[in-house]
Amino acid sequence: MMHLLFVALLFLPAMARAAACCGGGLPVPALVLGDEKANLSSTFSYATVGTDVNAEGIWKHRQITEQAQTLRMDSAHVIADRFQAGASVPIVRRARNEDTRTGLGDVALNAGYEFLPEWDYSPWKPRGLSYIQLTLPTGRSIYEASDVNQLDNTGRGFWALGAGAAFTKIRGPYDGVLLVDLHRSFGREVRGTPAGDLQISPGWGGTLTLGAGRSFKDVRVGGSLAWIYEDATQVSGGSLPDGALSRYASAALSLIYSPTPDWSASVAYTDQSLFGAPTNTPLARGVTVSYQRRFPR
């Protein structure tokens, strides 16, 4: 069962970046990826942001770093045969110097279908789960932020609809994971900002993640690399210019301990400054601690 928690850990680089600035890709989907009937997960992440990359790809190190902490609760449940549903709720705390803000992040609801079940052993066929996800604008967007350092920006703040798939494969002590998602964020009007009344129009985004690991009895060691992309945001009706497309790559190393099939605990390190050619994004480094409880069918 250790590889199942690792699948969730693959999304944490994006989550760390989302907490540290203004949102990345879709929130972490709450999924049942094993043979259990339901699971409940609790994740705490701590990230620091010390570098910004502008639209031309030029890096600038911050004189004062920002700290972001996220406490996230996830639950997923099989509702009928190969169908399932899940939800995730994040609480975000951001700090810079003595200034601190805490608020609700973007809540996500998702439904999944296991389109490639693993009923018979195959040396090559993976297990496949597709999902759709609805993201609610419960977090405060960067355009609504009133704090001078924009620390009260706790999410993207847009309705978003996405679809994705997770493929997992185990061969002996080794496992591999492929994750893909595509999502569309929908525009909204933001009134009463210092720049005037704004019409904000985001676009498409996507994530591609590859991961692999090896198990040693009750312990699993793994790594992953994720590529995240977001379209430029169009802004009209005020004095703000349009945004620019955002992209970055995030690496993660994880250690998972699972003494029984019913629960797992993990620690992971994520770094967004090691790979790729980032554009228009802050870069974060962070540590994440997770616990997952699984309930058998």
Give each language-model segment a name.
Residues P29-K37, R82, P117-G128, G172-D175, ...:
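Short loop/turn motifs that connect adjacent beta-strands in outer-membrane beta-barrel proteins
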Residues T43-A47, P90-V92, E114, Q133-P137, ...:
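Outer-membrane beta-barrel pore domains and translocons
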Residues D99-P202:
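Outer-membrane pore/translocation modules
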Residues I64-E114:
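Long, hydrophobic/aromatic-enriched structural stretches that serve as scaffold segments
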Residues A18-Q69, P137-S141, Q272, P296:
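Short glycine/proline- and aromatic-enriched beta-strand/turn motifs that initiate or cap beta-hairpins
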Residues E36, Q67-L71, T102-V107, P126, ...:
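Residues that define the transmembrane beta-barrel architecture of outer-membrane proteins
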Residues S45, G50-R62, R191, A195-R297:
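Outer membrane beta-barrel transmembrane domains
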Residues S42, M73-H77, A87, L109-F115, ...:
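Residues on the lipid-exposed face of transmembrane beta-strands in outer-membrane beta-barrel proteins
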